[in-house]
Every structure is written in C-alpha cells, then in structure tokens.
Amino acid sequence: MFLRSSVSRLLHGQIPCALTRSVHSVAVVGAPFSRGQKKKGVEYGPAAIREAGLLKRLSMLGCHIKDFGDLSFTNVPKDDPYNNLVVYPRSVGIANQELAEVVSRAVSGGYSCVTLGGDHSLAIGTISGHARHHPDLCVIWVDAHADINTPLTTVSGNIHGQPLSFLIRELQDKVPQLPGFSWIKPCLSPPNLVYIGLRDVEPAEHFILKSFDIQYFSMRDIDRLGIQKVMEQTFDRLIGKRKRPIHLSFDIDAFDPKLAPATGTPVVGGLTYREGLYITEEIHSTGLLSALDLVEVNPHLATSEEEAKATASLAVDVIASSFGQTREGGHIAYDHLPTPSSPHESEKEECVRI
C-alpha cells in the first residue's frame, strides 16, 4: 500500500517535464451509478478519482479536456427484480441509455471518451454509445471477472456481472428482454473482445468463453506468458489484420487487492502495478484508444482514508498512462539543444578564471 502510493507520487512529480504539445482531446464523463450491484459507495468513485487529480494530470500531459461533469441519472422509484433475482433492471437500463447518449456525443465530437464509474454495468452504455460512431470497434476488458453471465445464469443477480451478455450478438437467443433494455442494439462479436486478468470466472461464464471462442488471458496465462506476450497476442487478435478503434474497459479489481483495496469484489492474486500500467502504455502506443471506462472504485469500502486515496490514485495512473504518461518520466519536446549566446562566451569565461 505504502509502496504503491509512493510510486504514484513519484510519477506525479515527473509530470511537469511532460509533453508540451497536446496529443489528445479527452472528454471526461462522471457516471456516479451503483445499481448494477448491491453495495453502497461505488457512486462516489467519480468524485474520488477527480479528487485524486485526474484533470490536472491529463492537462499536464497536454490533453485538451472537455469535462461533462457527473451525470444525474433518472430515478426509478419502483424497480422490482427481474425473475425475482436480477436487481434494479429498469434503473440500469435507463441509466445506460442516458450514458450512451453522452458517450456518443463525445465520440462524435472527436474526443476520446473517459467514463468514470460507478459499477461495471455502465459498460452497456459506454460501448453502445461508442459503437454508434465506430461500429468496427474492439474491446479490451481488464478485470478479475468475465462479466458475461446472462440474466438466466447469474447467481448474484447483479447486472455488473452481466454487461457483455447484452452486447454480444451471438448470445442474444440466450438473453431475455429485461425491462428498460429494449433500446440496446448488440454491437459486439466474440472475435472483437479480449479479456486480461481473469481469476474469478463462474461455470456458465467459462462455458460461454469456450463455446464462443472468446480470447482471454487469466492471471495464470499472464504468469506463464508474461504481460508483454499477452499484449502482443491481444493486438494480433484485435488489430493485427486492420486498425480499428479500441475501447478499454478497466475494472480496478483487476489489480491485486493490496494495490486496490477500495473495490466491491476484490480477488487475491491480481495484476501488479507494473503489469497494469504496461497494458495501458501498450494500448496508448497503438494510437487507437478511442474510449476508456475506469470502474468499481468504491471509497466507502476502504478501511482507512489511505486505502481510499491509494485506490483512486491508482485509477488516475491507469487513465494517465492510457494517454501518454510513461514510467520513465515525461520528456520535453525539444526542437534543438541550447547553444552559448556568443561564440566567445567560453573564452571570456576562461579569462575570468585566470
């Protein structure tokens, strides 16, 4: 914990030497939404990430920023569970419809859209909105969980464990119509999705991954191959044949809980700091990042203020490295090296010394 906070402070201290030229136009959308699951507090994730210095960090990287603020979602007073199990379906459906409109507007305006969650059910809206302008997009899903249960296979009833099932075309004959979900148009196919960091996959999800040949890299795969090879294979799969926009959906619980304790479903044995930032640095290097979700930061689940701040600060590092922050430090964009003001300056200095 203390080590991760120190690393973050070191990176932050290097930023004043960062790029002096703007390289990205970034829209920031706060999505303070928690009804994709049952734990309170994840709706405060956007505020925590902002307070950790996100906008300042992006600005120091030279990004042009359009801040959409934090969205205010429609309240649904009577939202009975679907099938006596799936909670808050109408709230989730309506909120994602509203979010999709904002993401669509940001992307159509030429911005790379960063959505701050909020729980991971929000990916229904972010990917849907993104796909309206980039129907050929691909998705890199960094998470401890596969989040591909259907409303008929879920055990928890939480929609934050189901978002991808509503988006994948080939799954639609297995997905019932939930109230509030009629607006969704499935926009993904299995070859356009890669998972990184899985370590808590339910039996039905594993069946889906295998049946539809969805590429995934579990933590065991990362241990076996190394994160460099994982990223090489990810890019070969998604952008090897043709370049297309990347949607990065990053759940903070992909990291080991020692680094990101303030989250709702932590699982031991997660990504290290170096592995997590290598993922985002490599995605940035493609020049194809078009939208990014950073979800599941829950300050209320921290056991101390330091844990809450460390988790939010880690989220900022993930986003900043997606837009050009490098661990070797920032680099001023030099056009030329300075020269002495006159050709005799060195001779004059020598005379003074004599």
UniProtKB/Swiss-Prot annotation:
GO biological process annotation, one example: negative regulation of interleukin-13 production
One GO location term (cellular component): cytoplasm
Transit peptide residue numbers: 1-22
Pfam families (alphabetical): Arginase
Localization (cell): Mitochondrion
Enzyme class, UniProt record, top EC level: hydrolase
Pathway(s) the chain acts in: Nitrogen metabolism; urea cycle; L-ornithine and urea from L-arginine: step 1/1
Key words, A-Z: Adaptive immunity, Arginine metabolism, Hydrolase, Immunity, Innate immunity, Manganese, Metal-binding, Mitochondrion, Transit peptide, Urea cycle
Cofactor binding description: Binds 2 manganese ions per subunit.
Cofactor requirement: Mn(2+)
Domain of life per record: Eukaryota
Reactions that this protein is recorded to catalyse: L-arginine + H2O = urea + L-ornithine
Residues annotated as binding Mn(2+) 1: 120, 143, 147, 251
Chain sites annotated for binding Mn(2+) 2: 143, 145, 251, 253
Record-linked NCBIfam families: rocF_arginase
Subunit note: Homotrimer.
Reported function: May play a role in the regulation of extra-urea cycle arginine metabolism and also in down-regulation of nitric oxide synthesis. Extrahepatic arginase functions to regulate L-arginine bioavailability to nitric oxid synthase (NOS). Arginine metabolism is a critical regulator of innate and adaptive immune responses. Seems to be involved in negative regulation of the survival capacity of activated T cells. May suppress inflammation-related signaling in asthmatic airway epithelium. May play a role in promoting prenatal immune suppression.
The protein, known as: Arginase-2, mitochondrial
